[in-house]
């Protein structure tokens, strides 16, 4: 696995990441055990970067990543927000961003 440094964070992450939309189970039934095994397999292959979003399984993907991170606190997790509302500029208020951020923080632990 190749790694790159994120200079501003003084962190090194894998150049390949794992997207976790499928772990949210919107796409099919994925047990928590299977989801965690998938994350562990990626970790064992050298993946240290994981991508998620607050809408993946209505936060389920973030919550599963939170459990994974208990075993791997050095994992780098990026989440996205802003897909819970109609995609119009006036829906993206500072208050909405604060609420979405807080919800993801709670989900991710």
Regions found by a protein language model. Name each.
Residues 1-76:
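N-terminal binding-site loop/beta-alpha segment at the start of enzyme catalytic domains
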Residues 25, 72-78, 99-107:
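Short, Lys/Arg-enriched charge-dense amphipathic segments
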Residues 40, 88-109:
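Glycine/proline-rich, positively charged
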Residues 64-67, 80, 96-103:
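Generic beta-strand or strand-like secondary-structure segments
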Residues 21-33, 81-98:
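Active-site mouth loops of central-metabolism enzymes
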